Amino acid sequence: MGRLSVNLCGIELDNPVIPASGTFGFGYEFAELYDINCLGTFSFKGTTRDPRFGNPTPRIAECNMGMINAVGLQNPGVEKVISDELPKLAKCFNKKVMANVSGFSVEDYAYTCEKLDKEDQVGWLEVNVSCPNVHGGGMSFGTNPEAAAEVTRAVKAVTTKPVIIKLSPNVTDIVSIAKACEAAGADGISLINTLLGMRIDLRTKKPVIANKMGGFSGPAILPVAVRMVYQVSHAVSIPVIGMGGVSCAEDVIEMMLAGATAVEVGAANLVDPYTCRNIIADLPCVMDQYGIENLTDIIGGVK
């Protein structure tokens, strides 16, 4: 059997498969379906300084080869995440978890990360500067190299945990933003978040979601994600987590060949909650099929 383990910012993962934030709750919900300790880790639901009720409904809609969502970072706020959600997770998950953090100001990001820094259960801070469906924050920090670097510096000043900056594809030059984050001290980069999209109901002549626009995800965005992972991973010297349209073991291998150290799986979890477990089970067979003995050896191996 091939070797599946990878090292992500100094922490060893049994395998590179990571359910993406926003598609896996706080983890314990999925523990009712299978043993989530089979995962490399997972990125829990995007957490903000204060509670958020999210956007008006409808906020999720299916479309060809994917879905559009504008949930709007609904979450109980960092205090409740620490007091209520993490203790529930500790009962069913014995690995380090990735905390996904969003904010509406540099101070928001720093405050939330400083709170989570005190939690032993948290192994990495995934700082989301790329949410396309909230107003007054989120993606605005991820579309400008200087703003992304400012958030990175602020977070690095309050934590000793690895900081991974999650980038938006809705930019003209993602490489410059990744390099700015690296220069500001980021320990890793994750990409891509969803593509900004919109669909209109022909009968009502209204957008299919109340927010009008939202994040498009699903198999259709895989080629865009692979391209951006390739570009960024060849421009920085820190680990890259690839995501976007991943739904099977072959997609994981493709992302790693493009340069990803680990791979997040998002929308596919909403189609089939067993997706990540199945990918992990399928990886040894796919590795054998393509003559891969050690996943670490193929990172960035595209010719």
Descriptions of predicted regions:
Residues N55-N64, I200-G214, M256, A268-E293:
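C-terminal helical cap(s) of enzyme catalytic domains, especially alpha/beta-barrels
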Residues V246:
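Short donor-sugar binding/catalytic loops of nucleotide-sugar-dependent glycosyltransferases
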Residues L39-G40, K45, K95, V122-L125, ...:
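Short acidic/polar active-site loop segments enriched in Thr and Asp
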Residues M1-V97, S102-F104:
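N-terminal capping/small domains of soluble enzymes
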Residues T48-F53, P132-V134, L196-R199, L270-D272:
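Short gly/pro/ser/thr-enriched loop/turn and capping motifs at secondary-structure boundaries
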Residues K91, V106-I241, E250-V265:
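Alpha/beta enzyme core
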Residues A31, I82, L86, A149-R153, ...:
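Predominant activation on well-ordered alpha-helical scaffold segments within soluble catalytic domains
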Residues T296-K303:
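A short, charged, Gly/Pro-tolerant segment at domain boundaries
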